[in-house]
């Protein structure tokens, strides 16, 4: 009985295993089910390990990609710094300044993403070199200081005597030398010339500008008188005055000596006044006539009256040489100056104050487009480098003209004082 039961139990065990295989290792109750599940544990562990390893490989594969991106970004930063260095080397051009600004903008964006300390150090070195290069440019304060120095220099140069005035003084002394050069003794001529040279140097050191101008006027008047010296006795008298002047000039440093020089010049003026003068003081001699250039302004009719009061007339131009002389005097002072020409009697017919008509050859002296009679312009003036017509009631400077005096060679004539001629009264 027992023998028949054992084969039957074996058959039941085999049947149970087949059922388990058909169900895919499905858990069932009983001891056999638990043993089957425990038998497949290593396979589950291997599956979990494979999943974890795959995740790690995916993460590792991402690291080289980010590193390569960082390296490429560092290369871009280095290239930008190289371009910036080259741009600083050519800093003088405005386009390069703009390029540097762009490079700095890019540098700012790149520095914000710097990952490695070594790149930061390299950028710091480049910035240090850039600072050194920029440091060689002139500082704004230095530029301002240079500008201030130039301003002071301009102001100092502005206080120097005008070149034209210096040239004029030199020309006056040259003419005076030529006049004195006609003295009989050659040795005396040389001595006088040397004295005038010393006098010129001494006058250049006088501190007071007003005193210099006064001495310049005295020398101008002396030139006018000496230029027409006919008598040996008068030449000797002037030579004596220059000798006295020499003694004063020789000790110029003291202020008292400067005053002494001024007194000597005053005495010299008094001596010259005893000579024959073709023109009064403050009048200018030219080709046998004397001319007075006013320092005040009047209208055209009052200018005629002012000239008549001193025995002259508002200037009438008779030659091209006279026109050139008067035009130069007017343009040099940059003044609008009346002349004795108008078309008051008949519009378009120009006449001088002495009644003579304007010659056709003189029409060339009108400025372009003149006379145009805009607003009843009937009187002529010196304007710029030519003539212009303007309203007669306007106040302007004026020029008087009269014939120069004739000098006799009689000694008594030279010893007698020249008649005093008043200047036109101020307006």
Swiss-Prot record:
Sequence repeats lie at residues 96-118, 119-141, 142-164, 165-187, 188-210, 211-233, 234-256, 257-280. It is a single-pass type II membrane protein. Residues 1-37 are cytoplasmic. SUPFAM superfamilies: C-type lectin-like. It comes from the Eukaryota. Ca(2+) binds at residues 370, 372, 374, 377, 388-389. Keywords: Adaptive immunity, Calcium, Cell adhesion, Disulfide bond, Endocytosis, Glycoprotein, Immunity, Innate immunity, Lectin, Mannose-binding, Membrane, Metal-binding, Receptor, Repeat, Signal-anchor, Transmembrane, Transmembrane helix. Residues 59-427 are extracellular. Gene3D superfamilies: Mannose-Binding Protein A, subunit A. The chain crosses the membrane at residues 38-58. Residues 96-280 are annotated as: 8 X approximate tandem repeats. GO terms for cellular component: external side of plasma membrane. The keyword Transmembrane helix applies. Expressed in lymphoid and mucosal tissues, probably in dendritic cells. Also found in macrophages. It is found in: Membrane. Disulfide bonds join 279-290, 307-400, 379-392. Residues 286-401 form the C-type lectin domain. Signal peptide: none annotated. InterPro entries: C-type_lectin-like (IPR001304), C-type_lectin-like/link_sf (IPR016186), C-type_lectin/snaclec_domain (IPR050111), C-type_lectin_CS (IPR018378), CD209-like_CTLD (IPR033989), CTDL_fold (IPR016187). In vitro, is a receptor for HIV-1 and SIV and transmits viruses to permissive T-cells. Homotetramer. Interacts with C1QBP; the interaction is indicative for a C1q:C1QBP:CD209 signaling complex. Interacts with ICAM2 and ICAM3 by binding to mannose-like carbohydrates. Interacts (via C-type lectin domain) with CEACAM1 (via Lewis X moieties); this interaction is regulated by the glycosylation pattern of CEACAM1 on cell types and regulates contact between dendritic cells and neutrophils. Pathogen-recognition receptor expressed on the surface of immature dendritic cells (DCs) and involved in initiation of primary immune response. Thought to mediate the endocytosis of pathogens which are subsequently degraded in lysosomal compartments. The receptor returns to the cell membrane surface and the pathogen-derived antigens are presented to resting T-cells via MHC class II proteins to initiate the adaptive immune response. Probably recognizes in a calcium-dependent manner high mannose N-linked oligosaccharides in a variety of pathogen antigens. This is CD209 antigen. The gene is CD209.
């Amino acid at each position: 009985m027992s023998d028949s039961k054992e084969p039957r139990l074996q058959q039941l065990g085999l049947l149970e295993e087949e059922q388990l295989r058909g169900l895919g290792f499905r858990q069932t109750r009983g001891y056999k089910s638990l043993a089957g599940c425990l038998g497949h544990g290593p396979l589950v562990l291997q599956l979990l390990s494979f999943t974890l390893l795959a995740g790690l490989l995916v993460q590792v594969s991402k690291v080289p990609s980010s590193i390569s991106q960082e390296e490429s970004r560092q290369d871009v930063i280095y290239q930008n710094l190289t371009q910036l260095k080259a741009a600083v080397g050519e800093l003088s051009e405005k386009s390069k300044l703009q390029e540097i600004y762009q490079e700095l903008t890019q540098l700012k964006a790149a520095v914000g993403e710097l990952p490695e300390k070594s790149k930061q150090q390299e950028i710091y070195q480049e910035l240090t070199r850039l600072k050194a290069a920029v440091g060689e440019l002139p500082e704004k304060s230095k530029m301002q200081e240079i500008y201030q120095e130039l301003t002071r220099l301009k102001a100092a140069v502005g206080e120097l005597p005008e070149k034209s005035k210096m040239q004029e003084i030199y020309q006056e002394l040259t003419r005076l030398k030529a006049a004195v050069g006609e003295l009989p003794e050659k040795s005396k001529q040389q001595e006088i010339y040397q004295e005038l040279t010393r006098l010129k140097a001494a006058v250049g050191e006088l501190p007071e500008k007003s005193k210099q101008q006064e001495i310049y006027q005295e020398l101008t008047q002396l030139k006018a008188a000496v230029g027409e010296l006919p008598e040996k006795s008068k030449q000797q008298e002037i030579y004596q005055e220059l000798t006295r002047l020499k003694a004063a000039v020789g000790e110029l440093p003291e202020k008292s000596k400067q005053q002494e020089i001024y007194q000597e010049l005053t005495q010299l003026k008094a001596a010259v006044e005893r000579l024959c003068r073709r023109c009064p003081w403050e009048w200018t001699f030219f080709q046998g006539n004397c001319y007075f250039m006013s320092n005040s302004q009047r209208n055209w009719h009052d200018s005629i009256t002012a000239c008549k009061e001193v025995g002259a007339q508002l200037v009438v131009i008779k030659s091209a040489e006279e026109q050139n002389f008067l035009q130069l005097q007017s343009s040099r002072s940059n003044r609008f100056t009346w002349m004795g020409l108008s078309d008051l009697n008949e519009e378009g017919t120009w006449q001088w104050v002495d009644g003579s008509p304007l010659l056709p050859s003189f029409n060339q002296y009108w400025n372009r487009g003149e006379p145009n009679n805009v607003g009843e312009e009937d009187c002529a003036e010196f304007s710029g480098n030519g003539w212009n017509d303007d309203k007669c009631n306007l106040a302007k400077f004026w020029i008087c003209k009269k014939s120069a005096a004739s000098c006799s060679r009689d000694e008594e004539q030279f010893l007698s004082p020249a008649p005093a001629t008043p200047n036109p009264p101020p307006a």
